[in-house]
Structure formats: C-alpha cells, structure tokens
Regions:
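Aromatic-rich peripheral "rim/lid" segments of glycoside hydrolase catalytic domains that contact
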Residues: 308-309, 313, 468, 472-546
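Extracellular beta-strand-rich, repetitive "passenger/adhesive" scaffolds
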Residues: 21-28, 40-46, 60-73, 77-179
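Active-site clefts of carbohydrate-active enzymes
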Residues: 346, 376, 441-466, 485-497
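Compact beta-sheet-dominated domain cores in extracellular/mature segments
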Residues: 149-277, 284-285, 299-301, 516-520
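Bacterial Sec-dependent N-terminal signal peptides
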Residues: 1-20, 549, 611-613
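C-terminal outer-membrane/trafficking sorting elements
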Residues: 15, 546-623
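N-terminal carbohydrate-binding/catalytic regions of secreted carbohydrate-active enzymes
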Residues: 275-336, 343
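Aromatic- and acid-rich polysaccharide-binding/catalytic face
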Residues: 294, 309, 339, 388-437, ...
Length: 623
C-alpha cells in the first residue's frame, strides 16, 4: 500500500485522452527533452519526435518522478503543465504561460539567470517541496517572483505563508510555510513499522504532547529534506540528545541506536537554512555573507542572512521568557552561548557569578529548551583550554549537549604590544596551531566568532594575515563558521570615513565562501555522542511511482452524484458510513464527516480525486 495512491488520480480513466505524458526514463538517461523518456498515460505511446524541445512551446501535461534534467529552457504553453511528485527536476529555466505543480517530496532546481518567466505559475501542493534558484539571491527572488507562487488557488505571501531562504552565497530556496504533509514521521518499531506519529511544524513537542502517544517509544524515523530535528531524552532538552540535518536529502533511520532508542521525550523540527562559512560579528551589511550575530538575542534574520542569536550572559538565559525569545526566532538554527564568561572582571563573566563554571552551566542548561543546535560559550583565547574544558567536562557528567565549540583569537600569547610589525606568516601559523589544538581537545566543529591579528598590529599585518587565514578557514573541514572582528583601534576596519570599503573590507567582501556543512545528510556529533549513521542511497524507479489503470480496484457499484461537482457530492448507498476520506493527487488524506447536504468538496482545487468510502474506492471530479 506504500505507493498505492501516488499518482492514482491521473491514471484511472482520465476525463479524456488528453496529451498527458508520464516520465519513464526509458532511454537510459534523465534528459527531459528526450521524447523516448516519456509515454502517454493512457496509451503508453511515445510523444512524436521534436515535440518536447528546448525553447519550443509544450502544450502537454507532464508527470515527473525520480530525477530529471532539463539543461535548457522549458517553454510551457497555456495548456502546458509539469507535475512533480516524489521527484526532482533540475533545469535551466521555465518560461511561457503554463504551470509547474509541486506535490509531496517535489523539488524544482533552476540554474538560469532568469529562471522563471513572468507568465509561469508555480503551485505548491505540499510543504515538503521547494523551488531552488541556484543563482538568484533571496532579495532578487522576492522582487521578481514573490507573486508567482500559489497554494489552494491563493497567492502565497512572504513571510506569512511563504519562506524565501538563502541557499549559500548566491542562491535562494522558496517553499510554502503551510501545514500539510509531515516534515517528520516517527515509528514505535524498527524499520519504520508499528505505531507512528507526524510533525508538520516547528513547535516544541515534549513528553505527552508528542503525537500518537509515542513519548519514550520511538525507534525509527523519516526526516524530510530541508529540515533539521533535535531529539532529547528529557523534557528540558537535556539527557541523551542529538541533531539530525536533512540538508538536501531525506534522512531515513530504520534503527535508532541504544543512545536514543525509546528515549525520546523532546522533539523540535526546524526548516534548515543553507549558509556559507563567512559571517560578520555584528549586523554589518554588504559583506557578501550568509549569517551574522550581534552579541545579543534581539536581532532578526533578513532575506539574505541568517541571524544566530546569542545569550550574552545570565540575563538572557535565566527564565522561560528568554527561551521563548529564542524559540520564536525566524530562520535561526543555532544558539550561541555566553560571551567570555570566563572573565570575572569583564564581559558576561563579571555579572551574576557567571565566571563560576557551575553557575554558567546552570543557565546554559536552560537554553537547551530551545531545541536549536548549541554553540558553546566563547571564552578568551587561553580559557578554551581550562575554563571551557571544565565546563565541558561537567556538561558531559550532567548529560548537557554541546554541538559546536566557539573561540575568540587575538594572538595575545605572542606579546603583540611589542610587535606591531609582526610577520603575518608567523601570526597565521600561531592561529592554525591554536585551532588545531582546540579541535584535538574537543573533536567538534569550531565557530571562530571573534578574531584578528591583534589591535596592536598595523593594517598591513591584518591584511596579510587575512589573505593567509581565509583560504585556510574555507579549506579546513572542522571550521564550520567564522567572523572577522575588526579591532577597536579601527586600524583594520571594513569601511573608511566615507563608508567606502577599505582594502581589508574589500578583501573580506570579495572572498567567496563555501558551504558551512557540505554533507547532504548530516548527523551532528556532540560532546555526549559522536556516533554516526550510515545512509543508503535510495534508488528511484518511475514504475514504482506510476501505477497503471489495470492495477486499480475501483468500486463500480457505488455511484457518486453529481459528478463532476463544484460544491457537494452524495453517495447512493444506505450503508452506515464508518470511514469517509478524500485522497488528493499528492497522496494526502483528508478525513471527512457527512452532513445532511452531502459531502462538502467546495474547499478542494479543481481536479480528480479519490473517495474512500468504507474502504471502497470511487473516483470523482471537482470542477
């Protein structure tokens, strides 16, 4: 029954033998423009030669599963449609007057500089779908395409019910922010069996609020691509816990390890956001970066950048309101803990006894309730080897998770006051040795949230140091993010007094950054657990997705009237109704209750549907 209803509605006596073709991949390649890869949904005939060509108007309705590549312009006529369900179309651009309809697990990726023509409509049928514009940044995508996306005959609006997120440096991902198909599905038994529950939003699910009464009873799960999930053993986010990131592929875990199996009482699913390594310390515009932080929890993400909130000190972590502030952050996936709490005479450590490790750990523990990926307190340069080491050891003893290590580095150990003209290569070598030592101690990804060559060094040293450091940071796998912090002496600022780039600002701005997390599916290690999961590549077979009319078991004795209908339908039966369900084209099931006026279908979009009446299957049409 797994695939029974996928594409059911298109292939069982469609209203007419219209020009509808389904993807087969029969030619042995995945070329959209090869007619041998298509067949008619009713007759199985192949389209005529040169009827599906680049730039040529296509008036067919096409149904796609699996992965298809269109490396040139798709031109859809007024009747042209592309339906994608449980598949992926990687293309250059789509133009014309037609529609692209994205169902469950459907992804439309475009590389062109002008990827979507003004007459094209994109219809989202599911929240597990996206349009990715690889070379259009979010602000440009919003400006040109914000009115091109629909759901249930309504234009989607950013940010109310449409997300536009950055896809690394130059791209954007557009997806509906609607409650529809599950983003996370979890099961009581191994191998995706037993009782199951679904989560379709970013709310916190704790203890008895976990769907299907599966508190402490989860053994396997499916996480849809473009999302992350945090699982934890205890209701406050502590205990055995782990973050899974389904960046560009679904994560399917058929057997949770003993570390989490039947121990999950805390779940939070979040939309993933694709960022490069380079960021800024402070809300600084025009630096070609994908993320920033600002030593506080009062910032906001914008279209092109993810904001990483920081709980600077005790006042941002000591009550439930502080947690709510973090939970409500739009587009934030990580939480930075305290700023230099090791300093009893300055920064956050001077307030509320935060320089005492036990005190800081108490408030850090409260932050785990946010369900975000956790970044450690950022200590002064040397304190990462003692104060933070003690913090981490006690966190491990109390089962308090740290996912990422944050560091500050200013080359203080080299007597910088007396070496304003230090050799940049020597400065760089010390920087590398420091980071390698930190990684050797903790074995976790590193965020360098503040660094420079030291405020006592001149501009030339800073600039030469950066020219050495930036390529190293990009090439080093354990460096996940970094943000250069110009010294307070203003010797190495990004901008001059006229707000023009300095040489250092120009260098930082023009340096192209790479992906912060390169894996398409990522299991985040932490101070508590470094166990990884092996994921098998799932093979897609179009024949498994498209079912022929002969395989369907329609009930010919039950009649629906009127059919087609625009508002209500009735069933010619005296049977007691114990099951009544509409099944949409994307497989979504809608449970219904009959009324005296019949079955209300006015809320449905036009199309073909299945009615499951007491497990008897009947087709009807909404017009």
């Amino acid at each position: 029954m797994k695939n029974y209803f996928k594409f059911l509605l298109m292939f069982m006596g469609l209203i007419s033998y219209s020009q509808q073709y389904q993807w087969t991949g029969a030619s042995g390649n995945n070329d959209f423009f090869n007619e041998l890869n298509w067949k008619h949904t009713a007759t199985s005939e192949i389209p005529l030669e040169n009827t599906i060509n680049p730039g040529q108007i296509i008036e067919f309705e096409l149904f796609i599963t699996c992965e298809v590549i269109a490396d040139d312009e798709i031109n859809l006529g007024e009747n042209g449609k592309i339906n994608v369900i449980n598949g992926q179309l990687n293309g250059h651009s789509v133009t014309g007057l037609g529609q692209v309809i994205l169902g469950d697990s459907s992804y439309f990726n475009l590389n062109g500089s002008y990827p979507i023509g003004g007459g094209v409509t994109v219809i989202f049928e599911s929240n597990t779908s996206w349009v990715r514009l690889n070379n259009i940044e979010p602000t440009t995508a919003y400006y040109y395409y914000h009115d091109s996306f629909y759901h249930d005959n309504q234009t989607l609006s950013y940010p109310e019910n449409l997300r536009i997120d950055n896809y690394y440096h130059n791209g954007s991902v557009i997806r509906p922010n609607i409650l529809s198909n599950p983003l996370l599905k979890f099961f009581s038994d191994f191998n995706l069996e037993g009782e199951f529950g679904n989560i379709s939003n970013s709310d916190l699910f704790i203890g008895e609020s976990i769907p299907a009464y599966l508190n402490n009873d989860i053994s396997s799960f499916i996480l849809k691509r473009g999302h992350m999930v945090t699982f934890a053993e205890n209701n406050d986010g502590t205990g055995n816990s782990k973050v899974f990131i389904a960046s560009e592929e679904d994560i399917i875990v058929e057997e949770l390890s003993n570390y989490l199996n039947n121990k999950i009482s805390f779940i939070r699913v979040l939309p993933w956001n694709w960022v490069s390594k380079k960021g800024t310390a402070g809300d600084i515009q025009y630096m070609n970066n994908d993320w920033f932080y600002k030593w506080s929890n009062n910032g906001s993400s914008d279209l092109n950048r993810e904001y990483a909130p920081m709980a600077w000190g005790k006042g941002a972590a000591d009550d439930e309101n502080d947690v709510e502030i973090i939970v409500d952050k739009y587009k934030s996936t990580h939480l930075l803990a305290f700023n230099e709490p090791d300093d009893c005479n300055g920064q956050s450590g001077q307030y509320g006894n935060m320089c005492v490790v036990d005190t800081s750990l108490t408030y850090y523990k409260n932050l785990l309730k946010s369900g975000l990926r956790m970044v450690s307190p950022a200590c002064r340069q040397g304190a990462v080897f003692d104060w933070l080491n003690e913090f981490n050891s006690k966190a491990i003893e109390q089962n308090i998770r740290i996912d990422v290590i944050a560091v500050h580095w200013y080359d203080w150990a080299s007597n910088p006051e007396n070496s304003p003209n230090a050799n940049p290569q020597d400065v760089f070598n010390r920087f590398v040795n420091y980071l390698e030592s930190v990684h050797e101690m903790y074995g976790l990804p590193i965020w360098i949230t503040e660094f420079n060559a030291n405020r006592h060094r001149n501009e030339w040293v800073h600039r030469q140091f950066l020219q050495l450091a930036l390529p190293f940071l990009e090439e080093t796998n354990y460096i996940e993010r970094y943000s250069f912090f110009p010294p307070t002496t203003q010797v190495a600022n990004f901008f001059d007094s006229n707000d023009s780039f300095t040489q250092i600002g120009e260098l930082y701005n023009e340096f192209m950054s790479t992906k912060s997390i390169t894996e398409t599916r990522y299991v985040s290690s932490s101070n508590l657990d470094s166990e990884n999961y092996n994921f098998e590549q799932i093979e897609c077979n179009p024949d498994d997705e498209f079912l022929s009319i002969n395989s369907l078991e329609l009930d010919e004795e039950i009649i629906i009237y009127p059919n087609p209908s625009s508002d209500y339908i009735n069933i010619n039966t005296d049977e007691e109704i114990w099951k009544l369900q509409i099944i949409k084209m994307n497989g979504e099931k809608i449970d219904l209750s009959p009324s005296g006026n019949g079955i209300d279908i006015s809320f449905l979009s036009k199309g073909i549907y299945i009615l499951n009446f007491n497990n008897r299957i009947i087709k009807f049409v909404k017009n």
